[in-house]
Amino acid sequence: MKNLLEQIQSRLDELNKAERKVAEVILQNPQQATRFSIAALAQAAAVSEPTVNRFCRSFGMSGYPELKIQLAQSLASGAAFVTQAVAEDDGPEAYTRKIFSNTIASLDSAHKLLDPRVIDRAVDLLIQARQIHFFGLGASASVALDAQHKFFRFNLAVSAQADVLMQRMIASVAHTGDLFVVISYTGRTRELVEVAHLARENGASVLGLTAAGSPLARASTLCLDIPLPEDTDIYMPMTSRIVQLTVLDVLATGVTLRRGVDFQPHLRRIKESLVPTRYPLDEDN
């Protein structure tokens, strides 16, 4: 279950203008908000005290005292970082802090919500696959390419596609034993959802790395739920790629461990093959 800070963050777009001001003051500095009186919070948000009370009730709380209690509990549970949108008047210190804080918050949120049992089932799909196709579009396309770079090392037939037409053609000739790993921040990209349905109709399995409850999640055989609240109205997605890449690192580690120690010489040979391509370290410089 989401703590209060996570609930506020996830519902920002649902709040009316006045209540959103309250939410933004809380998210900007939750530690300070726990010390505010209702009058101080209303003043900081430039709203009335009744607006603060309505904000509390919209989150199922009886009033402001309960909000302060739940806010303190959220901070005590380790939710010290919450995402903050980059503003047009932010200076280098502010936007640097926000980007790092947003990334930390997203990684922490994803870690808490990932079910180890689902991770284990995802590793099963990867190990058992006859061939694996990594699909992504937009910002997720580079993540799909990185996955191909990781997973070819396991003696698996892998490919990565960022072209919609290629994705459809490959899905149209899928077979039982094929695995399609479809990566999408929103899970609402029509082309990717259609490809997932097409692959499953032809007997393949689909592993979705996407938002829970999204059309892509529903179209997938198995979904790794990746909660990624971020400001995408003006600025390009920032934290989504980091979380997706980290989840793929988790899956790659799971596959490596399943392969066992006998597989380590194979991985070592791949790594050692790159040694001649690098200049030696010059300890004097």
Curated annotation (Swiss-Prot):
This is HTH-type transcriptional regulator HexR. Involved in regulation of glucose metabolism. Transcriptional repressor of the gap-1 gene and of the edd-glk-gltR-2 and zwf-pgl-eda operons. Acts by binding directly to an inverted pseudopalindromic sequence in the promoter region. Keywords: DNA-binding, Repressor, Transcription, Transcription regulation. Gene3D superfamilies: Glucose-6-phosphate isomerase like protein, domain 1 (3.40.50.10490), Winged helix-like DNA-binding domain superfamily/Winged helix DNA-binding domain (1.10.10.10). The keyword Transcription regulation applies. Residues 122-261 form the SIS domain. Residues 38-57 bind DNA. PANTHER family: GLUCOKINASE, HTH-TYPE TRANSCRIPTIONAL REGULATOR HEXR-RELATED. The keyword Ribonucleoprotein does not apply. Residues 2-78 form the HTH rpiR-type domain. InterPro entries: Homeodomain-like_sf (IPR009057), HTH_RpiR (IPR000281), RpiR-like (IPR047640), RpiR-like_SIS (IPR035472), SIS_dom (IPR001347), SIS_dom_sf (IPR046348), WH-like_DNA-bd_sf (IPR036388). One of its GO terms (biological process) is carbohydrate derivative metabolic process. One of its GO terms (molecular function) is DNA-binding transcription factor activity. It comes from the Bacteria. It comes from Pseudomonas aeruginosa (strain ATCC 15692 / DSM 22644 / CIP 104116 / JCM 14847 / LMG 12228 / 1C / PRS 101 / PAO1).
